[in-house]
Amino acid sequence: MARVKRGVTAHAKHKKVLDQAAGFRGRRKNTIRTAKAAVDRSKQYAYRDRKNRKRSFRALWIQRINAAVREQGLTYGRFIDGLAKAGIEIDRKVLSDIAIHEPDAFGALVASAKKALEYLKNTETPNAFEGAVR
């Protein structure tokens, strides 16, 4: 059986790691041991931050919606509740976009949410336990 020398595969693996570490500062870009550690850590950060990006974008959309809704005399929570009661299912990304680029359409959404909240407020049945003697 022939002897297998690992030089070619080892060189390919090292080259792959060093290519991924291109742009790093100092010894981390050209020493295989530190480059491998830095690349591994950067992949962990990338994985974590892909999850965090979703959170931060949702928070941004909510802040934008809240600002636009407060200009029209409603809070974010009441607005979302009103949309749900009105049967309007639009996600926060689209709501944020509408609030920025089409204020008239957003005003119509706010009006329909207010109308749904007001309608349900007037038609609620009284609580059966109110006024009961204990």
Swiss-Prot record:
Highest taxon of source: Bacteria
NCBIfam families from the UniProt entry: rplT_bact
GN (gene name): rplT
Family label: Belongs to the bacterial ribosomal protein bL20 family.
UniProt keywords, alphabetically: Ribonucleoprotein, Ribosomal protein, RNA-binding, rRNA-binding
Protein name: Large ribosomal subunit protein bL20
One Gene Ontology molecular-function label: rRNA binding
HAMAP family named in the record: Ribosomal_bL20 (MF_00382)
Organism: Brucella anthropi (strain ATCC 49188 / DSM 6882 / CCUG 24695 / JCM 21032 / LMG 3331 / NBRC 15819 / NCTC 12168 / Alc 37)
Free-text function comment from the UniProt entry: Binds directly to 23S ribosomal RNA and is necessary for the in vitro assembly process of the 50S ribosomal subunit. It is not involved in the protein synthesizing functions of that subunit.
GO cellular component: ribonucleoprotein complex; ribosome
An annotated GO BP: ribosomal large subunit assembly
InterPro entries assigned to the protein according to its UniProt record, in alphabetical order: Ribosomal_bL20 (IPR005813), RIBOSOMAL_L20_CS (IPR049946), Ribosomal_protein_bL20_C (IPR035566)
